[in-house]
């Protein structure tokens, strides 16, 4: 007596995302790196180019009053929220779906970024930043970097903590910040060489590169 084999269906997965908040997309790219199941990636389109960072960097370098890092950071906050809502999140694909914007998670991600300033500041200090002398400026630099990473932080939380794909955005900000340190010891005596002005610009350039080129084709 022969028995019929049951057809093997597609493997199911558990997601913490609300199915009602999902909309279908097309097929997944063939060259998509796997960072767990279901995969998550950001489509590389003109939509993910952070035009606001280009404008903000130009304003900070050319027109800000004494390279005001504090004002630049406060201006960056709403820009990053709008960039996430209107550009980055619509290009983020989770499995074969696009997650709709989670307004509660926007606030949670903001709080997360503030909490991340502490380990970020410690990391900056370990790399040789002044601690006791310029603690407020070092914290402002850390806050600026964390705000730059806000879209990536939100996406990690919104895709069930799949850090694998989004770590490249954090790395690009850190590398840009680190490379810009080379401008500080130069014997030029320029006002923009003061701590942490070069690192703020470097972090912005790193974020521009990351959000523009680190997405998936």
Curated annotation (Swiss-Prot):
Compartment(s) where it occurs, according to its Swiss-Prot or TrEMBL record? Endoplasmic reticulum membrane
Keyword field contains Endoplasmic reticulum: yes
> Which is a GO BP term held by this UniProt record?
GPI anchor biosynthetic process
Keyword terms of this UniProt record? Endoplasmic reticulum, GPI-anchor biosynthesis, Membrane, Transmembrane, Transmembrane helix
InterPro entries found in the cross-reference section: GPI_biosynthesis_protein_Pig-F (IPR009580)
Give the pathway listed in the UniProt entry for this protein.
Glycolipid biosynthesis; glycosylphosphatidylinositol-anchor biosynthesis
Q: How does it sit in the membrane?
A: Multi-pass membrane protein
GO cellular component terms listed in the entry, alphabetical order: endoplasmic reticulum membrane
User: Chief location of this protein?
Assistant: endoplasmic reticulum
List the Pfam families hit by this protein, alphabetically. Answer: PIG-F
The Gene Ontology terms for molecular function here are: mannose-ethanolamine phosphotransferase activity
| Role according to the record | Acts in the GPI biosynthetic pathway between GlcNAc-PI synthesis and GPI transfer to protein.
Q: Could you say which protein family the record assigns here?
A: Belongs to the PIGF family.
Record's protein name = Glycosylphosphatidylinositol anchor biosynthesis protein 11
Organism field: Eremothecium gossypii (strain ATCC 10895 / CBS 109.51 / FGSC 9923 / NRRL Y-1056) (Yeast)
């Amino acid at each position: 007596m022969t028995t019929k084999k049951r057809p093997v269906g597609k493997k199911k997965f558990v997601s913490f995302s609300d199915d009602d908040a999902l909309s279908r997309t097309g097929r997944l790219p063939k060259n998509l790196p796997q960072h767990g199941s279901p995969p998550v990636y950001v489509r590389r389109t003109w939509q993910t180019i952070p035009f606001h960072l280009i404008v903000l960097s130009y304003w900070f370098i050319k027109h800000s009053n004494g390279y005001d890092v504090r004002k630049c950071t406060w201006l960056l906050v709403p820009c990053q929220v709008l960039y996430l809502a209107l550009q980055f999140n619509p290009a983020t694909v989770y499995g074969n779906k696009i997650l709709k914007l989670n307004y509660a998670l926007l606030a949670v991600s903001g709080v997360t970024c503030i909490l991340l300033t502490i380990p970020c500041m410690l990391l900056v200090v370990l790399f040789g930043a002044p601690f006791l002398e310029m603690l407020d400026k070092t914290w402002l630099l850390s806050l600026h970097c964390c705000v730059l990473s806000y879209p990536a932080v939100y996406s990690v939380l919104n895709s069930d903590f799949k850090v694998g794909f989004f770590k490249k955005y954090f790395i690009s900000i850190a590398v840009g910040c680190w490379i810009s340190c080379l401008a500080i010891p130069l014997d030029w005596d320029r006002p923009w060489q003061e701590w942490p002005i070069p690192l703020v610009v470097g972090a912005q350039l790193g974020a521009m590169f990351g959000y523009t080129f680190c997405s998936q084709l």
